[in-house]
């Protein structure tokens, strides 16, 4: 156990109570409120390496990693030092910055699909822009997204997936007009036949297909054998674009993302998280002929006050430099496999149905027999059991994503001893569930 003993959250509770009077739900992003797992959220005070400390002094082994960016560990000294130097020159220019060229070259060299790139300030912004670009390039309005794949909170992506009504493009949030999502078609993840049917029903109208090539926002779901290849074939057949949302998986699954790992090259890619080294960032890129449509080179407008700011560029450059060191992804795969395999083995030994897996430094598991191929399968997980497991692990000093439907992340800062401690905690908690 790595928390203070006994486990107390008095200060966290006080701060969150005050926050609820100041911000909707007391948070700046919904999942942080612990609504999915119950109880009060933990308020962090600081993070370092693979650990987080809350305001009550409890220390946690962190498997959220600020939702993915902290692949080198929190507050890596080389990133911090680079930021200190950059800040002396100013926090934002609102003008061209030489650091943009450096990070752009690194991204282009790494990601197979990207010949040109545009930096923005978040993954949501990147996906908003890439959707506009898909439509501008093809002259078509409709897109296909997959049930359970998250592409940010922009109106056109907020479509409830998985039912016949949802396929008609009805909005999944108040305030989103039906007309906004009318051209957003949905299909179950890992279902090529459903994708073929949508193209057949909408001949010459679909601009393209966008997806998380490995799903991290319905829990952790990998593509079936041939699924990504099948999407590439279908989109080429219909002169439509294939877009990989690699905001979460880019530079995490491999240096070149899922597209490098699985050998399937899309037309466009969105990025975020890791390429900002923990600072707000996003990017989209792809074939030169498509990207030349983006203003000011072309007529498709997109802009941003803080886009390409020197701090995000600096943190991103240093993070990618660290990731290029030898054996980086081999180590991530090694420790994450040991963690994932261990969790599943402990679940089986303690009598709990569970399934899951990992790829590189990304993992997840469900309290269900499985296998899980899509969001409908994921929803079979025992959410009450997960809530109890989450709370138990929290009290044992292990910080997991406060939702069954979020992937977990390891970092280069996690040690074999951290994995040992995590598995020991899991055995204690699962034995008592």
Curated annotation (Swiss-Prot):
The modification N6-(pyridoxal phosphate)lysine is found at residue 273. One of its GO terms (biological process) is protoporphyrinogen IX biosynthetic process. Keywords: Chlorophyll biosynthesis, Cytoplasm, Isomerase, Porphyrin biosynthesis, Pyridoxal phosphate. It is found in: Cytoplasm. GO terms for molecular function: glutamate-1-semialdehyde 2,1-aminomutase activity; pyridoxal phosphate binding; transaminase activity. The keyword Isomerase applies. Pathway: Porphyrin-containing compound metabolism; protoporphyrin-IX biosynthesis; 5-aminolevulinate from L-glutamyl-tRNA(Glu): step 2/2; Porphyrin-containing compound metabolism; chlorophyll biosynthesis. Its cofactor is pyridoxal 5'-phosphate. It catalyses: (S)-4-amino-5-oxopentanoate = 5-aminolevulinate. Its EC number is 5.4.3.8. It is an enzyme of class 5 (isomerase). HAMAP family: HemL_aminotrans_3. Belongs to the class-III pyridoxal-phosphate-dependent aminotransferase family. HemL subfamily. Homodimer. PANTHER family: GLUTAMATE-1-SEMIALDEHYDE 2,1-AMINOMUTASE, GLUTAMATE-1-SEMIALDEHYDE 2,1-AMINOMUTASE 1, CHLOROPLASTIC-RELATED. This is Glutamate-1-semialdehyde 2,1-aminomutase. The gene is hemL.
